[in-house]
Amino acid sequence: MLTKKNLKNPIFCIVAMNENRIIGDGKNLLWHLPGDLKRLKKITMGSPLIMGRKTWDSIGRPLPGRANIVLTNSVTWKAEGAIAVNSFKDAIIKADEWIDNNIEINQNVTQKKIFLFGGAEIYKIGLEYCDNIEMTKVKFNSKTGTKFPKLNESDWKKTKLEHNLAKNGVPEHSYWHYRRKVQIIE
């Protein structure tokens, strides 16, 4: 059984959402934030990413310099550059193996962190294992779409890292780091 206590590497969550916790429409991102994409790359480079198949499909290609682990219900699904798994536990095992194999090859780049990369089902399954969330909050008027799970705000220490006003068609957004106040160990 997978518990936080027996995790080999810490699991982080990275997400962009609006004030209604909307993360997408089930197919695409709802906004384009070039600065956030650079930030995402910097934070996740050298780490395994765990994502659902719909998230993989919306990206359309593997993200270089990272393991692209895709959790899918299909036992026959394959895609170039993806590591297909059928359970969250298998995703963690593959992520740990990738870290172990890559840390010796390129220890300057490989991070001992696993990132939950979306979508909503991946966050729902994996959030209990996370003690850190890298969050982008986007000012974007939408009340319908795929939602990030509701957090118990009192369980998290929130630090605002940066705020960006709307400019040149890019919506207002801010970067936050959430750290769980009491880390759950089972």
Task: Annotate the PLM regions.
Residues 2-186:
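Enzymes that bind and transform nitrogen-containing heteroaromatic metabolites
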